[in-house]
Structure formats: structure tokens, C-alpha cells
């Protein structure tokens, strides 16, 4: 079973994707789209639905919050499909380039992320209407990053 929902928060589109190999999904993941920026790419087990939902977006860049499969599972596919760079923290770049092992339950629930060339973000990530400042927030993972919107331009 799967979940696909779309919500809008002002200028931000939030897409919820959940996958359950048996029955209702136990958890879901959000992919955010704001003004040419995709934040996170969801789990690879939901690739068909994610690519379908985001096919008409025209991203300029993809940002990853961290390397976990449920957030990075379609980084390669979306980057390749839209011909855009994938950006993240230096640790995210290192992990996403390596042939890393994942636990069997992770592969079963989320699928495996493909290796992808993640470029390290700069001090700011700018789009036409947003200025995002990456802030390293280790805890959930050593590479976890949040993106603070510091200058919205209507």
C-alpha cells in the first residue's frame, strides 16, 4: 500500500509519500518544492509516484537534508531527469558517493539510494524568491542539515 498526498503552505508545495510492503505504511516522508528548489527526494520504493508528482516541476537544484534512504532515495533519478545538481553537507556528499551498506529492514521499507555526485552547498542557496541558509544540525544523523529561509522576495 502507498500514500501520496499534496499540501501547500504558502509558496511551498509539500508532497507526502508513504510505502508499506504489507498493509498501511508505518511512516511517510515529505518532499518539498519551493521556487525551483526540491528539498529531499523521498524513498526509492516510491520512485514511480515521486517522479509522476514532480514531472512538471522545473527545479534549478535539489537539496538533501541528510543521506538516509527515505530522504535521498531518488536524488540520482530526479537529478538525472531534470538535469540539475544535487547539493548537501560535505558528509552527505561523502556518504552518497560511497558504496554503503544498509540494513535489510531499510532496504525493505525504503529501498536503496543510488550513488550520486552530491556537490557541497555554499553559504547560501538562492532562487528567484528565496534565500536559504544551510545550517548543520547533527543529531538525527551526523550530516543532518536544515535550510533556514532568510530573505523571502514576493
Residues of each region from the PLM?
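Conserved beta-strand hairpin/beta-sheet module of binuclear metal-dependent hydrolase folds
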Residues: 2-54, 146-154
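Metallo-beta-lactamase
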Residues: 131-138, 142-154
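Short catalytic-loop micro-motif centered on adjacent basic/acidic residues
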Residues: 37-40, 61-64, 133-136
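Short, glycine/acidic-enriched loop or turn micro-motifs at the edges of active sites
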Residues: 43-44, 69, 92, 139, ...
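Active-site HxH/HxHxD metal-binding segment of metal-dependent hydrolases
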Residues: 48-126
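Short Gly/Pro-enriched turn/cap motifs at secondary-structure boundaries
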Residues: 22, 115-116, 136-138
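Short, well-ordered coil/turn elements that cap or connect secondary structure elements
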Residues: 9, 33-34, 81, 127-129
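Short Pro/Gly-enriched beta-strand edge/turn motifs at strand-loop
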Residues: 10-18, 104-107, 128-132
Amino acid at each position: 500500500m502507498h500514500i501520496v498526498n499534496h499540501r501547500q503552505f504558502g509558496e511551498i508545495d509539500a508532497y507526502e509519500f508513504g510505502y508499506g510492503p504489507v498493509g498501511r505504511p508505518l511512516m511517510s516522508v515529505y518532499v518539498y518544492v519551493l521556487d525551483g528548489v526540491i528539498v529531499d527526494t523521498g524513498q526509492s520504493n516510491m520512485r514511480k509516484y515521486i517522479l509522476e508528482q514532480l514531472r512538471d516541476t522545473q527545479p534549478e537544484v535539489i537539496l538533501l537534508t541528510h543521506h538516509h534512504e527515505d530522504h535521498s532515495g531518488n536524488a540520482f533519478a530526479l537529478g538525472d531527469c531534470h538535469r540539475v545538481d544535487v547539493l548537501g553537507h560535505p558528509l552527505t556528499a561523502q556518504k552518497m558517493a560511497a558504496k554503503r551498506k544498509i540494513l535489510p529492514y531499510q532496504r525493505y521499507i525504503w529501498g536503496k539510494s543510488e550513488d550520486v555526485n552530491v556537490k557541497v552547498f555554499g553559504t547560501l542557496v538562492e532562487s528567484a524568491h528565496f534565500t536559504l541558509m544551510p545550517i548543520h544540525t547533527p543529531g538525527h544523523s551526523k550530516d543532518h542539515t536544515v535550510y533556514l529561509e532568510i530573505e523571502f522576495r514576493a
